[in-house]
Amino acid sequence: MKIATKYHGNIDIDEKDIVRFEQGIPGFLEEKQFVLLPLEDTPFIILQSVNTPALGFVLIEPFSYFPTYEIELDDNTLEQLQITGEQDVALYVILTVAEPFDDTTANLQAPIVINVNKRLGKQVILTNTNYKTKHRLFPEKVAK
């Protein structure tokens, strides 16, 4: 299947690689189908809408930048995503890419959770947490 993308141009994808977000993503509720596309030679992954070429979120696996990051998924999320164990889960966070890049932040309060076996995804909004929507990727660099 051919799709147009924000960062990769026109590409072929396999329909079995599509991740379905049954409830959409907050702010994009009508967007239900996405594909994960690695950005070559970077730790970044694009969560690309299959239907809207201009909609691509830059993601990272949070543990490289935030080694103590941990979340607990509620029973409702486990059921929605049909998660039976940790081996089912891939966890990402959305970046807000800034200029200069040192000012880039990660949304740790609303991670993207994907059941890699069932190809189901959800952006989970964490409550009762110290995580915020803007955590600097490079905290040792102080914003000017």
From Swiss-Prot:
HAMAP family: FliW. It comes from the Bacteria. Acts as an anti-CsrA protein, binds CsrA and prevents it from repressing translation of its target genes, one of which is flagellin. Binds to flagellin and participates in the assembly of the flagellum. GO terms for biological process: bacterial-type flagellum assembly; regulation of translation. Keywords: Bacterial flagellum biogenesis, Chaperone, Cytoplasm, Translation regulation. It is found in: Cytoplasm. One of its GO terms (cellular component) is cytoplasm. It holds the Pfam family FliW. Belongs to the FliW family. InterPro entries: Flagellar_assembly_factor_FliW, Flagellar_assmbl_FliW_dom_sf. This is Flagellar assembly factor FliW. Interacts with translational regulator CsrA and flagellin(s). It comes from Geobacillus sp. (strain WCH70).
